[in-house]
């Protein structure tokens, strides 16, 4: 059998083709396919182009596409129609990218427990797979969420620099401000037009500088980390109070590449935070394989 999985996040989209034993047959990475960022037409175009290239030797038996921002409603219907039209004889399913994470958990076959996934990349969201099905808590997008994403880290840092530039007594030579100005190549005020043009992905690209400054002992970077992990911990507490039988949270996203982020969040929750040692696209393939059973 030929099993295809797609993991479409806010920054990149991974495509994986494997057999029923998990043997990798083909893999490729393209850009963002989040329809809220690139538009649904560009999203569908990228997904169909990538899947066609991935499966150039023949149609897959099953496909699961987990798409950030495209898991529900009209967007999900458009994606399903496009993939089904491309491979009309294949079993096709699509949903939010969090499904990929959930299928990276060893507990996915334990029907007595629920599995939660926490995504902290460009954006952030919590998803839960339980006897009630799959549902989301938080993850309303950068206009309405208030912390815990790469966008939030970058925005918090840039907002602090903008504020400091307007205060004559501010020290602009701190590790965090120095790193931000170096990346911007100009003052934050002069960079405002380019920040708005770059939008959410560009602002999120400043998040790693917070951790770099943190390692240099910058107190503002420490407070940004603390604020954002406080918000995430409170969200996880609400989810646990609602669901009850969750003891493991599968985690993914660029922020988890920073050990300080995982350490800070872990210290604020009694849930076990599990960062899988496989790519989320592997979870997409596992979900696709289940469609054939």
Where would I find each of the regions flagged by the language model?
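Glycine- and other small-residue-rich loops at beta-strand/loop junctions that grip anionic moieties
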Residues: 68, 146, 254
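Polybasic, low-complexity association/targeting segments
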Residues: 64-71
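ATP-binding/phosphotransfer module of carbohydrate and carboxylate kinases, centering on a glycine-rich
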Residues: 1-62, 82, 86, 105-116, ...
């Amino acid at each position: 059998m030929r099993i295809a999985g797609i993991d479409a996040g806010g920054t990149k989209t991974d495509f994986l083709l494997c057999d029923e034993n998990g043997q990798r047959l083909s893999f490729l990475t393209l850009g963002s396919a989040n329809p809220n960022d690139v538009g649904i037409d560009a999203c569908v175009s990228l997904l169909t182009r990538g899947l066609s290239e991935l499966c150039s030797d023949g149609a897959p038996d099953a496909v699961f596409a987990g798409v950030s921002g495209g898991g529900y409603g009209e967007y999900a219907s458009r994606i399903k129609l496009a993939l089904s039209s491309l491979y009309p004889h294949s079993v096709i399913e699509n949903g939010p990218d969090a499904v990929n994470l959930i299928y990276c958990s060893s507990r996915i076959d334990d029907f007595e427990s629920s599995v939660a996934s926490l995504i902290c990349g460009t954006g952030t969201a919590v998803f839960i797979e339980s006897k009630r099905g799959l549902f989301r808590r938080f993850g309303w997008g950068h206009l309405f969420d208030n912390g815990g994403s790469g966008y939030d880290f970058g925005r918090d840092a840039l907002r602090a620099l903008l504020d400091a530039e307007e205060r004559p007594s501010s020290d602009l030579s701190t590790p965090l401000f120095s790193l931000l100005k170096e990346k911007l190549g100009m003052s934050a005020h002069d960079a405002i037009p380019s920040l708005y043009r770059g939008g959410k992905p560009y602002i999120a690209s400043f998040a790693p500088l917070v951790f770099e400054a943190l390692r240099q002992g910058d107190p503002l970077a420490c407070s940004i980390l603390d604020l954002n992990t406080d918000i995430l911990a409170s969200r996880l507490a609400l989810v646990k109070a609602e669901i009850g039988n969750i003891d493991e949270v599968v985690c993914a996203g660029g922020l988890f590449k920073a050990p300080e982020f995982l350490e800070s969040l872990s210290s604020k929750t009694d849930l076990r935070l599990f960062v899988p040692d496989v790519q989320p696209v592997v979870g997409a393939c596992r979900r696709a394989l289940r469609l054939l059973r």
